[in-house]
Curated annotation (Swiss-Prot):
Protein name in the entry: Turripeptide Lol6.2
Cystine pairs: C4-C16, C8-C21, C15-C29
MF terms in GO: ion channel regulator activity; toxin activity
Localization per record: Secreted
Disulfide bond among keywords: yes
Domain of life of the source: Eukaryota
Length: 37
């Protein structure tokens, strides 16, 4: 799995559940992992 560094959105809900969404004007999901496909 790859480390997530993605914009927090509905498309990366799985990532955000296992990572940390943070930011002020830009929200990134950091510290989670990309779901295996």
């Amino acid at each position: 799995s790859l480390v997530c560094d993605l914009e927090c959105s509905a498309e990366v809900t799985t990532c955000c559940e296992t990572g940390t969404c943070h930011g002020i004007t830009t929200y990134n999901c950091v510290g989670g992992t990309e779901p295996e496909t």
